[in-house]
């Protein structure tokens, strides 16, 4: 163990690729142990020397191998390659040559400049010392697989079909291969020449957009913190980022690869997928003249005002656009308390036609539809096409001046008002049906009640101010017609007109004015009207008494007739018994008895006592 205390000699570093087993033999053997061999995998690469300088051009070995393909001595080529790579570590266990370089030397050393795959294997085992002991099947699987991969992936090798049947193909050197570092070929599944072309065009377009976006978009200064490029922060064709919108400097972009930069919020349009609409990139900068803007504003304002005026006018007037009937009810008519006369009675006088409607002065703008001075129709906007309310003739029902106008006049008026809005009529069909139902109900109520018949002959003027005090002279009534109407109902209707009710109700009786003397007093008119009403009531009572008497007489006659019928029945029974008692008599006697039986007896026979 004393030998371990001695200093170990400094072993020289090997730069020419010598094996470590050669260096181990120089170790001192004083320690009493023999040198041990070490596996080849642990012998390389050798450590670099301290004064090692990395060569500038690393392609010298490849260039030398490609330029010396024609030389027939492979050993000289290998020495030249080793000399070019002096003072550098070995790349592989056999030296600085790659598998592609070894295959190139093997094919170039052949006479026909072509070798099969098995011949390349043999050349490797024979000429490269590293593969001499690796020719068996167990240890050659790895490096033979590497040779096959290099043959298929490098452009410098070309496969040629063998003429003989059942033989492997030839491998030759491609004369069109570029000198220098060879480019690896892609597999057949990755042959995407079309994709490469499209990607090249996309790159050019990205560069153009990048330059145009940086220069033209409002001269915006790009953020210095962008990792890919400043121009990609702008999206000139995006509708969300018009005007040169710039992303926040805190936005972290992805790596600057083609896939990643095109995949995130890509401003690049897909090629041949979107139609070209002809819009320029800076279409957002297009402006409109001031005159065009004013015309558009005026057009929009006039349309809005017209629609608003039409809707307001229809709502104020109570019209429905579809039916032309008023949607709001007329002002309610509230007459004083009145009793209703039986249906079918009308008191007519010879002078009722003298009550004519007085013309209204032109200064008062009374609404013809609602008969009101403060109607909302007068405060609305002017009627379309210069139509005035006076030019529309409406026919009111004389029985109720404040009621709704007739359907013909309202349709005429609504058609003129709704000349420009006929398209909106279909939206109000439901309102039309509701108004038609209401109109039918009102007509039925007016026709079924006594007011609808008695008030048809009234004046179309307001009847709120109609009073007995305004009339002078006597009141006349056609009593005969009244009595005839009573007799038509066989006396089943009763007339009961209280005096107080007649004095307060003037809507159910048609009054006439036979005097034009306006200077007479109200007291005289009231007294004369009261006298005539008393006479009318007395006549009606007399008529009722006469009817009662007639009814009593008819009742008595009916009683007499019933008594006579009873007597006749008794006589018939006695005749039948008499006939049964004389059945043994002759046929003539039977005939006499049968002849004595009357079929219809109106009076007792003379022989019955």
From Swiss-Prot:
Bias category Low complexity: which stretches?
Answer: 80-89
Task: Give the region (Disordered) as residue ranges.
Answer: 1-89, 181-263, 321-365, 384-411
Among InterPro entries, the record links this protein to:
Fork_head_dom, TF_fork_head_CS_2, WH-like_DNA-bd_sf, WH_DNA-bd_sf
Which residue ranges does the Swiss-Prot or TrEMBL entry mark as DNA-binding?
94-200
Q: List residues modified as Phosphothreonine.
A: 43
Stored SMART domains: FH
Give start-end positions of Polar residues composition bias: 62-79, 220-229, 254-263, 388-397
User: Where's it mainly located?
Assistant: cytoplasm
Q: Which CDD domains match?
A: FH_FOXO
* Keyword Chloroplast attributed: no
Give the UniProt record's GO annotations in the biological process aspect: cell differentiation; glucose homeostasis; negative regulation of cell growth; negative regulation of cell population proliferation; negative regulation of insulin receptor signaling pathway; regulation of DNA-templated transcription; regulation of lipid metabolic process
Q: Where is the composition biased (Pro residues)?
A: 327-339
**Keywords, alphabetical:** Activator, Cell cycle, Cytoplasm, Developmental protein, Differentiation, DNA-binding, Growth regulation, Nucleus, Phosphoprotein, Transcription, Transcription regulation
Answer whether the UniProt record assigns the keyword Kinase to this protein.
Answer: no
An example of a GO molecular function for this protein is:
DNA-binding transcription factor activity
Compartments where found: Cytoplasm; Nucleus
In the UniProt record, the signal sequence range is none
What PANTHER family does UniProt report for this protein, alphabetically?
FORKHEAD BOX PROTEIN O (PTHR45767:SF2)
Subunit structure, briefly? Interacts with melt.
| Record-given protein name | Forkhead box protein O
Q: What is the source species? A: Drosophila virilis
Give the gene that encodes this protein.
Answer: foxo
């Amino acid at each position: 163990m004393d030998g371990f205390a001695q200093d170990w000699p400094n072993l020289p570093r090997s730069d020419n690729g010598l094996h470590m087993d050669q260096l181990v033999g120089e170790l001192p053997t004083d320690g009493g142990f023999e040198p041990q061999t070490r596996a080849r995998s642990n012998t390389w690469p050798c450590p670099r020397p301290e004064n090692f300088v990395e060569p500038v051009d690393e392609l010298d070995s490849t260039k030398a191998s490609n330029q010396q393909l024609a030389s027939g001595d492979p050993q000289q080529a290998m020495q030249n390659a080793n000399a070019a790579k002096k003072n550098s570590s070995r790349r592989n266990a056999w030296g600085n040559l790659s598998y592609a370089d070894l295959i190139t030397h093997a094919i170039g050393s052949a006479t026909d400049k072509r070798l099969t795959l098995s011949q390349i294997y043999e050349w490797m085992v024979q000429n490269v010392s590293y593969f001499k002991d690796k020719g068996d099947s167990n240890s050659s699987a790895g490096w033979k697989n590497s040779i096959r991969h290099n043959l298929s992936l490098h452009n410098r090798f070309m496969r040629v079909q063998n003429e003989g049947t059942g033989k492997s193909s030839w491998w030759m050197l491609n004369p069109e291969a570029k000198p220098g570092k060879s480019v690896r070929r892609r597999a057949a599944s990755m042959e995407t020449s079309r994709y490469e072309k499209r990607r090249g065009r996309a790159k050019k377009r990205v560069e153009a957009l990048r330059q145009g976006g940086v220069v033209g978009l409002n001269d915006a200064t790009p953020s210095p913190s962008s990792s890919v490029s400043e121009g990609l922060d702008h999206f000139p064709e995006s509708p969300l980022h018009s005007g040169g919108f710039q992303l926040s400097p805190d936005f972290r972009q992805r790596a600057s690869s083609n896939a990643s930069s095109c995949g995130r919020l890509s401003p690049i349009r897909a090629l041949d997928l979107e139609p070209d609409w002809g819009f320029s990139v800076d279409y957002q900068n297009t402006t409109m003249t001031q005159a065009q803007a004013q015309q558009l504003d005026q057009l929009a304002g006039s349309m809005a005002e017209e629609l608003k005026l039409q809707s307001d006018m229809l709502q104020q007037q109570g019209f429905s656009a579809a039916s032309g009937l008023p949607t709001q009810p007329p002002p309610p008519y509230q007459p004083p308390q009145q009793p209703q006369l039986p249906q079918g009675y009308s008191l007519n006088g010879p002078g009722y036609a003298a009550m004519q409607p007085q013309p209204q002065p032109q200064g008062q703008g009374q609404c013809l539809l609602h008969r009101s001075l403060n109607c909302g129709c007068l405060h609305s906007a002017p009627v379309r096409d210069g139509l005035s309310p006076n030019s529309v003739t409406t026919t009111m029902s004389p029985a109720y001046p404040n009621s709704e106008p007739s359907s013909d006049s309202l349709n005429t008026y609504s058609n003129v008002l709704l000349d420009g809005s006929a398209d909106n009529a279909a939206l109000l069909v439901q309102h039309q049906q509701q108004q038609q139902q209401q109109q039918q109900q009102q007509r039925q109520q007016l026709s079924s009640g006594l007011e609808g018949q008695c008030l048809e002959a009234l004046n179309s003027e307001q009847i709120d101010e109609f009073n007995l005090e305004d009339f002078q002279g006597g009141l006349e009534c056609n009593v005969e017609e009244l009595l005839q109407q009573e007799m038509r109902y066989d006396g089943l209707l009763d007339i009961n007109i209280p005096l107080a009710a007649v004095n307060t109700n003037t809507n159910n009786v048609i009054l006439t004015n036979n005097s034009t003397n306006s200077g007479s007093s109200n007291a005289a008119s009231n007294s004369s009207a009261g006298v005539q009403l008393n006479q009318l009531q007395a006549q009606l009572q007399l008529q009722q008494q006469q009817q009662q008497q007639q009814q009593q007489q008819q009742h008595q006659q009916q009683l007499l007739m019933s008594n006579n019928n009873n007597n006749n029945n008794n006589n018939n029974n006695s005749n039948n018994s008499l006939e049964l008692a004389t059945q043994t008599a002759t046929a003539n006697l039977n005939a006499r008895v049968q002849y004595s039986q009357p079929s219809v007896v109106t009076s007792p026979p003379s022989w019955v006592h």
